């Protein structure tokens, strides 16, 4: 998943003259450069379900946070409101992953479910690309909880019937 998201974010930022990034609850994507403005907020200190930031964001990234939101549809509509046209929203969430209450764990989406979710938040369904990664061995290895990746034991081959994580890129 990280490899694919890295590729997606690199592809987006390479096509934009100026990049104004908002990252919600993370700092992995700190994109740097002369033409980059980077803002980071953390949930629950900044409640994306209730608040919007002023700004002209053309890239908003929410990696592994929306599953923790009590009102993800409100948050999705707030993201849509904060995003410039054209702009990109990159979101990832777990699917077949142990419950992890930080502070709560509420929601999971399949690839199709993620597309419907983003459509209900205001994005055009024809401008949403979803994908997923996982496999049966990965799901079994995480029982009873997350494990560190071991190249010798764990396959990276994708099986769409066993998604561990789901992500989307929505273009406004």
Label each region the model flagged.
Residues 1, 5, 57, 110:
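Hydrophobic (often cysteine-bearing) scaffold residues that line and stabilize catalytic clefts
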Residues 1-39, 129, 137-153, 161-169:
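N-terminal accessory regions of S-adenosyl-L-methionine
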Residues 10-100, 111-115, 168-171:
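Conserved SAM-binding loop
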Residues 70-80, 84-172:
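S-adenosyl-L-methionine-dependent methyltransferase catalytic module, highlighting the catalytic core
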């Amino acid at each position: 998943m990280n490899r694919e998201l890295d590729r997606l974010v690199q592809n987006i930022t390479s096509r934009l003259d100026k990049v104004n990034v908002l990252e919600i609850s993370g700092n992995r994507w700190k994109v740097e450069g002369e033409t980059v403005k980077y803002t980071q907020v953390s949930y629950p200190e900044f409640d994306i379900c209730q608040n919007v930031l002023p700004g002209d964001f053309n890239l908003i990234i929410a990696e592994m946070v929306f599953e923790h939101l009590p009102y993800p549809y409100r948050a999705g509509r707030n993201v849509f409101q904060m995003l410039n046209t054209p702009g990109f929203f990159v979101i990832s969430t777990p699917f077949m992953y142990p419950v992890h209450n930080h502070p709560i764990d509420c929601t999971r989406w399949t690839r199709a479910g993620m597309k419907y979710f983003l459509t209900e938040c205001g994005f055009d369904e024809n401008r949403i690309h979803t994908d997923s990664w996982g496999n049966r061995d990965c799901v079994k290895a995480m029982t009873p909880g997350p494990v560190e990746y071991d190249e010798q034991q764990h396959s990276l081959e994708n099986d769409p019937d066993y998604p561990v994580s789901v992500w989307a890129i929505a273009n406004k």
